[in-house]
């Protein structure tokens, strides 16, 4: 017997497809899908040391159902996989200097086609007109774009300047393209 608990059509995260469907429910545009995946992941994860030091929490189904806590690489890998299979192939993880997070490839033909969506630190960095999230390459060239944001959201113990997260972006950041989707509960 495998009991399932789904309340008000929420929490059916037992398969990758069901998790992705719930996380993008209500999206009317591609940009909505990007924001909803980011929002649903960050709302349901806690920044905490993982139980396992390996890649076990990189699977979105395991991360959301079993662990619920993570460090940046776990959230980044799971988020990148959701973006990739959610209609954004070419999405990637950006390995900054001390942080890892996903960039959704929203529009491959646009100047800012990639959007750095930091699930772990509850932030994304908007262009100067505050219209669209930027990719890490732009932020690496202009750290002020990251300094304007409050990382870890509005609920923090004390205000901390965003200088440290901004300094993580550099022109020599690395990349990975995780697309893991294998576990079912």
Question: What are the language-model segments listed below?
Answer:
Residues 1-67:
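Secondary-structure boundary elements
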Residues 29-35, 85-91, 108-114:
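Loop/turn elements at helix/coil->beta-strand transitions in domains of secreted/extracellular proteins
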Residues 47-107:
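Active-site neighborhood of thiol-dependent amide/isopeptide-bond enzymes
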Residues 30, 68, 72, 175:
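Aromatic-acidic/polar surface patches that form glycan- and anion
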Residues 96, 104-185:
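His-Asp-centered catalytic microenvironments across diverse enzyme cores
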Residues 19-22, 34, 38, 55, ...:
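Generic ordered-secondary-structure signal
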């Amino acid at each position: 017997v495998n009991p399932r608990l789904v309340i008000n059509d929420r929490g059916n995260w037992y398969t990758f497809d069901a998790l992705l469907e719930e996380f993008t429910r209500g999206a009317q545009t591609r940009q909505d899908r990007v924001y909803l995946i980011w929002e649903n992941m960050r709302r349901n994860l806690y920044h905490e040391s993982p139980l396992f030091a390996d890649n076990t929490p990189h699977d979105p189904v395991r991360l959301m159902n079993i662990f619920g806590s993570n460090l940046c690489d776990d959230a980044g890998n799971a988020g990148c996989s959701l973006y990739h299979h959610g209609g954004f192939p070419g999405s990637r993880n950006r390995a900054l200097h001390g942080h890892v997070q996903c960039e959704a490839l929203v529009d491959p033909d646009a100047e800012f086609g990639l959007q750095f969506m930091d699930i772990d630190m509850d932030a994304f960095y908007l262009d100067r007109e505050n219209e669209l999230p930027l990719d890490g390459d732009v932020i690496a060239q202009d750290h002020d774009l990251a300094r304007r944001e409050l990382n870890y959201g509005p609920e923090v113990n004390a205000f901390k300047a965003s200088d440290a997260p901004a300094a993580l972006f550099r022109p020599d950041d690395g990349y990975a393209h995780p697309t893991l989707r294998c576990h079912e509960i």
